[in-house]
C-alpha cells in the first residue's frame, strides 16, 4: 500500500537575513511570518490539505541546497512522498537561481510535485507541469 502524499511548506531564513539572534527565541520572526502567510494562503485553496507538514531551515543560507531541511525535503520528493511544496517566495527555496530552476523545471515535474511560490504568483499546476 502506497503512503499518502504530503503537502509541505518549506520555511527558510539565513543568519545574513538579519532576524536570527542566537539564544533569544526558538525561531526567527521571519519564520513565523512565512508560516502565517502560507497558512492564510492554504485556507483559500480547496485543493490543498490543511494538514500540511512543515520543514524549516532557520539560520541557513539559500545559496546552496546543503541545508538539513532541504535535504530532507529532497529525499522525500525522490521517495514519492510529496504532492505539493509551498514557499512564501522563491528566495526562501533557493537564492541560486540556476540550481533552484533545475529543481523547478526538471526534478519536481519528474516526480509530479506541484510547486507554489505565493508572493511570486507561481504555481506549477497552472503551468501544466503537474
Question: Model features per residue range: what roles?
Answer:
Residues 1-130:
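Short, structured surface patches at the beginning of a domain
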Amino acid at each position: 500500500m502506497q503512503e499518502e502524499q504530503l503537502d509541505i511548506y518549506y520555511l527558510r531564513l539565513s543568519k545574513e537575513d538579519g532576524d536570527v539572534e542566537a539564544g533569544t527565541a526558538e525561531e526567527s520572526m521571519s519564520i513565523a511570518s512565512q508560516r502565517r502567510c502560507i497558512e492564510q494562503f492554504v485556507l483559500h485553496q480547496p485543493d490543498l490539505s490543511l494538514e500540511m507538514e512543515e520543514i524549516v531551515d532557520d539560520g541557513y543560507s539559500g545559496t546552496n541546497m546543503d541545508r538539513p531541511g532541504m535535504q530532507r525535503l529532497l529525499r522525500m520528493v525522490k521517495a514519492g512522498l510529496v504532492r505539493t511544496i509551498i514557499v512564501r517566495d522563491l528566495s526562501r527555496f533557493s537564492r541560486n537561481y540556476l540550481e533552484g530552476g533545475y529543481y523547478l523545471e526538471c526534478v519536481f515535474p519528474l516526480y509530479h510535485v506541484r510547486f507554489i511560490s505565493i508572493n511570486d504568483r507561481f504555481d506549477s499546476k497552472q503551468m501544466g507541469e503537474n
